[in-house]
């Protein structure tokens, strides 16, 4: 795990801006506190901050080059099949100077050209410079576990692992991308390829960008998860195959030259990972859990249950979140607005885990691969209700949408969306500030600009292009391309790298995900049971209470905070003169929103998102 940055000039005779590369790397010391390295060749300059994981010797430093130094690469991430690739490349005559996983990339490129990406199993964002061809290749792993941001203009290209670092390049004016702001308010994250800065883009997951002969290329997809290659077999047979897939995904992620452990929340997913690790380790697995003084949001007893079963070297801590201290750090590290409240416990968990290990395995990705969220079952119910005869669906939608009880807001929203297209209804279930609520909050100019829901249009395009015919898998495909990459994996990357911790996600292994995509939806979601086939894998491995407990999630009591502890701060942030003068929101509408929340309507998530947006403006736009 590391931080990478670089620049490429369009003019082949230009001198690259090495100082900009150094500034960007200096802004990412937390991603790589162990070492740094730079390379300049013609119009290209590359920079790297190193967090040493594999081959801790100086020979493992980056940039890595081939035998004659003509090809160089900087990598943020891990290549899990590097030993197999190394043997194959050595058999073809390639010479290696290190034991690093990253070095295989330059030699693989010599053999395969830009198609080298097809052979990598791992998590990565990388930049490869081919000096003789004057070719720069940027690439991101299949599911976007590692981030990569870039800005292109008439002078050339500049890129970095973090938005905040890219902003230090001085190559673009810090203007907000208003379309991205609207998308953030809908989703609580900025979806790819947008970023919160105008003219800056995320390289989408599974894409590469090739620059050659003075031309800055466009992102091109080298990987697309396929849902149109269904597998056959009974639940028992597919469970056995999935068990082997999870076991292998865990095995390849336990290779490390530094201390390694695991997150253990006590939920199904992290517990399964710990069980698999324990069965493959000769030493007790180091496990880490974080709890909160609010018992409603603490899972420590469940984590202890799994720890006791497998005899792990367990570490747990109970914290009282210090919001005043943490929020500014959040805003700075994320580089753009991000309002998933589970980012806070993830932050504390990573901070605590880093005191004991340098690498941790997590259970992220299972919900998106195997249908773990309620919105999948809600969508299935809506499909069934819409198939009722005659006018019944419309009448039911009207009845549910007009329930007068204030506490029944979710039921009313469900009723109002019952007759909408599938992707619009699904977005409504996932959205934190639905389109009609955003429009009501906006000032006149914003209200006019977003009369159409651009986020719904984007979701519609992805939904229509899905290769899945199964309705459950079609929604999983949508979540994998949006929520998994731009919320879950972003949250884990930022929280972990802020504390120089590498996190590996076995359940987002590319081979496991391909198998999951081939499994019928009915083996994932059956009745009220979510993640059915994964639960079958876990049955013989975990206590019954872990298997049957209700999904709790990793969020925090935002509604209560925004009504009590953070109420004064939210008013100060959202209603002061600075916020009013931006012209984004109608101050009267913000006043009404805050009042509604104080009166008992659950608007905490919306207020939290508005706060994160305003604080981002102050940190990155107003400076």
Explain the meaning of each model-derived region.
Residues 329-333, 354, 376-378, 561-563:
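Short low-complexity, flexible loop/linker segments enriched in glycine and/or proline
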Residues 1-4, 23, 42, 168, ...:
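Adenosyl-5′-phosphate
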Residues 93-96, 336, 595-600:
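A short glycine/serine-rich beta->alpha loop
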Residues 1-334, 346, 350, 539-540, ...:
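Cysteine-centered catalytic environments shared across enzyme families
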Residues 105, 349, 405-415:
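Glycine-rich phosphate-binding/catalytic subdomain of phosphoryl-transfer
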Residues 38, 147-150, 272-275, 369, ...:
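Generic hydrophobic alpha-helical membrane-span motif
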Residues 166, 289-290, 336, 380-388:
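Short beta-alpha connecting loops at secondary-structure transitions
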Residues 348-406, 483, 488, 492-512:
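Active-site adenylate/phosphate-handling loop in enzymes that bind or generate adenylated species
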């Amino acid at each position: 795990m590391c931080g990478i940055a670089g620049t490429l000039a369009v003019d082949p005779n230009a001198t690259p801006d090495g100082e900009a590369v150094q500034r960007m790397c200096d802004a990412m010391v937390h991603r790589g506190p162990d070492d740094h390295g730079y390379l300049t060749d013609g119009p290209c300059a590359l920079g790297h901050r190193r967090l040493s994981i594999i081959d801790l010797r100086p020979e493992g430093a980056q940039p890595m080059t081939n035998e004659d130094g003509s090809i160089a690469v900087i990598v943020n991430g891990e290549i899990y099949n590097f030993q197999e690739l190394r043997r194959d490349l050595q058999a073809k005559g390639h010479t290696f100077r290190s034991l690093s996983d990253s070095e295989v990339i330059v030699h693989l490129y010599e053999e395969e050209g830009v198609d080298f990406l097809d052979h990598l199993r791992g998590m990565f964002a990388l930049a490869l410079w081919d000096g003789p061809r004057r070719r720069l290749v940027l690439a991101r792993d299949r599911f976007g576990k590692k981030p990569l941001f870039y800005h292109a203009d008439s002078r050339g290209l500049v890129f970095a692992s973090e938005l905040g670092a890219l902003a230090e390049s001085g190559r673009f004016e810090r203007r907000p991308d208003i379309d991205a702001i609207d998308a953030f308010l809908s989703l609580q994250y900025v979806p790819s390829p947008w970023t919160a800065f105008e003219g800056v883009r995320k390289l989408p997951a599974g894409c590469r960008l090739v620059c050659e002969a003075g031309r800055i290329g466009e992102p091109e997809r080298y990987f697309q998860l396929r849902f149109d290659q269904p597998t056959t077999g009974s639940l028992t047979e597919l469970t056995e195959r999935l068990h082997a897939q999870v076991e292998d995904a865990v095995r390849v992620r336990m290779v490390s030259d530094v201390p390694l452990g695991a997150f253990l929340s006590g939920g199904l997913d992290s517990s399964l990972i710990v069980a698999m690790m324990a069965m493959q380790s000769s030493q007790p697995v180091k496990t880490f859990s974080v709890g909160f003084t609010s018992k409603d949001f603490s899972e420590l007893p469940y984590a202890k249950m799994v720890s006791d079963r497998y005899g792990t070297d367990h570490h747990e801590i109970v914290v009282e979140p210090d919001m005043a201290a943490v929020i500014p750090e959040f805003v700075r590290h994320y580089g753009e607005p991000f309002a998933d409240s589970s980012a806070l416990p993830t932050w504390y968990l990573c901070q605590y885990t880093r005191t004991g290990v340098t690498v941790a395995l997590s259970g992220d990705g299972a919900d998106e691969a195997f249908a773990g969220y309620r919105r999948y079952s809600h969508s299935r119910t809506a499909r069934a209700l819409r198939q009722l005869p005659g006018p019944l669906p419309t009448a039911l939608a009207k009845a549910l949408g007009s329930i007068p009880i204030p506490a029944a807001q979710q039921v009313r929203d469900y009723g109002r969306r019952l007759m909408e297209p599938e992707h619009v209804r699904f977005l409504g279930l996932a959205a934190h500030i639905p389109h009609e609520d955003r429009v009501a909050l906006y000032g006149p100019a914003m209200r006019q600009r977003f009369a159409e829901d651009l986020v719904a249009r984007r979701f519609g395009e992805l939904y229509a292009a899905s290769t899945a015919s199964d309705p459950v898998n079609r929604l999983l495909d949508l979540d994998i391309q949006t929520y998994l990459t731009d919320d879950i994996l972003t949250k884990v990357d930022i929280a972990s790298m802020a504390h120089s911790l590498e996190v590996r996600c076995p359940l987002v292994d590319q081979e496991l995900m391909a198998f999951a995509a081939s499994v019928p939806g009915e083996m994932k979601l059956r009745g009220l049971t979510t993640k059915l086939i994964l639960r079958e894998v876990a049955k013989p491995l975990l206590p019954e209470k872990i298997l049957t407990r209700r999904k709790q999630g990793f969020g925090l009591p935002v509604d209560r905070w925004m009504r009590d502890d953070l109420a004064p701060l939210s008013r100060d942030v959202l209603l002061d003169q600075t916020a009013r003068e931006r012209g984004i929101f109608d101050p009267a509408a913000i006043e009404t929103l805050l009042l509604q929340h104080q009166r008992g309507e659950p608007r905490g998530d919306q207020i939290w998102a508005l706060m994160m947006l305003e604080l981002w403006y102050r940190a990155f736009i107003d400076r």
